[in-house]
Amino acid sequence: MANESTTIEIGESSTMTKRTSHVVVDEKKKGFVAATAGGGYKRGLAIFDFLLRLAAIVTTITASSVMYTAEETLPFFTQFLQFQAGYDDFATFQFFVISIAMVASYLVLSLPFSIVSIIRPLAAAPRLILLISDTVVVTLTTAAAAAAAAIVYLAHNGNPNTNWLPICQQFGDFCQAVSSAVVAASIAVVFFIILIVISAISLKALILYFSSG
């Protein structure tokens, strides 16, 4: 009886060991599958983030360069006066050119962080840095675009209450150029909003993944 009891105990121990090993293997497989699926989802968001940053770079460079080159001289002039309009005649447009150029430079510098997010989709630090930085930069972009839009509106419509006459009837090409620059900057603002949403979604997914793991 003692031998039979010993034999039964060994059998139960072996069975429990096998079950435990199967459970550990299954848990590892589940963890690997979850990490692979989560990483693929976040890598897709990171790739979209990178492409969107490239588009924003093109948009901001276009906005800044178009505003910088906006200039028009009327074909008629007097002996002492020449009618000319340029971006440097308006402090707001100068602020626009400098600010949007800084935004374009930031976007170029942010590309390595976006690439790191593609290579390591489960890394939270690059995504957090991009989220904070994008939030700050979108404020600057919005301020520059809004200020320039106000001047463009006055250039097109004037202000009868202050006797400010519209100048776009005379400087049509100049107004068209600055209006295009403002539109491009506004598109860049939309890009930044999408980038911020992408970073927020990625961080939320990372928090849920690590908390559940």
Swiss-Prot record:
<dbReference type="GO" id="GO:0005886">
    <property type="term" value="C:plasma membrane"/>
</dbReference>
<feature type="transmembrane region" description="Helical">
    <location>
        <begin position="181"/>
        <end position="201"/>
    </location>
</feature>
<feature type="transmembrane region" description="Helical">
    <location>
        <begin position="135"/>
        <end position="155"/>
    </location>
</feature>
<comment type="subunit">
    <text>Homodimer and heterodimers.</text>
</comment>
<comment type="function">
    <text>Regulates membrane-cell wall junctions and localized cell wall deposition. Required for establishment of the Casparian strip membrane domain (CSD) and the subsequent formation of Casparian strips, a cell wall modification of the root endodermis that determines an apoplastic barrier between the intraorganismal apoplasm and the extraorganismal apoplasm and prevents lateral diffusion.</text>
</comment>
<dbReference type="Pfam" id="PF04535">
    <property type="entry name" value="CASP_dom"/>
</dbReference>
<feature type="transmembrane region" description="Helical">
    <location>
        <begin position="95"/>
        <end position="115"/>
    </location>
</feature>
<feature type="transmembrane region" description="Helical">
    <location>
        <begin position="44"/>
        <end position="64"/>
    </location>
</feature>
<dbReference type="GO" id="GO:0071555">
    <property type="term" value="P:cell wall organization"/>
</dbReference>
<keyword id="KW-0961">Cell wall biogenesis/degradation</keyword>
<dbReference type="InterPro" id="IPR044173">
    <property type="entry name" value="CASPL"/>
</dbReference>
<comment type="similarity">
    <text>Belongs to the Casparian strip membrane proteins (CASP) family.</text>
</comment>
<keyword id="KW-1133">Transmembrane helix</keyword>
<feature type="topological domain" description="Cytoplasmic">
    <location>
        <begin position="116"/>
        <end position="134"/>
    </location>
</feature>
<keyword id="KW-1003">Cell membrane</keyword>
<feature type="topological domain" description="Cytoplasmic">
    <location>
        <begin position="2"/>
        <end position="43"/>
    </location>
</feature>
<feature type="topological domain" description="Cytoplasmic">
    <location>
        <begin position="202"/>
        <end position="213"/>
    </location>
</feature>
<feature type="topological domain" description="Extracellular">
    <location>
        <begin position="156"/>
        <end position="180"/>
    </location>
</feature>
<protein>
    <recommendedName>
        <fullName>Casparian strip membrane protein 1</fullName>
    </recommendedName>
</protein>
<keyword id="KW-0007">Acetylation</keyword>
<dbReference type="InterPro" id="IPR006459">
    <property type="entry name" value="CASP/CASPL"/>
</dbReference>
<feature type="topological domain" description="Extracellular">
    <location>
        <begin position="65"/>
        <end position="94"/>
    </location>
</feature>
<keyword id="KW-0472">Membrane</keyword>
<feature type="modified residue" description="N-acetylalanine">
    <location>
        <position position="2"/>
    </location>
</feature>
<keyword id="KW-0812">Transmembrane</keyword>
<dbReference type="InterPro" id="IPR006702">
    <property type="entry name" value="CASP_dom"/>
</dbReference>
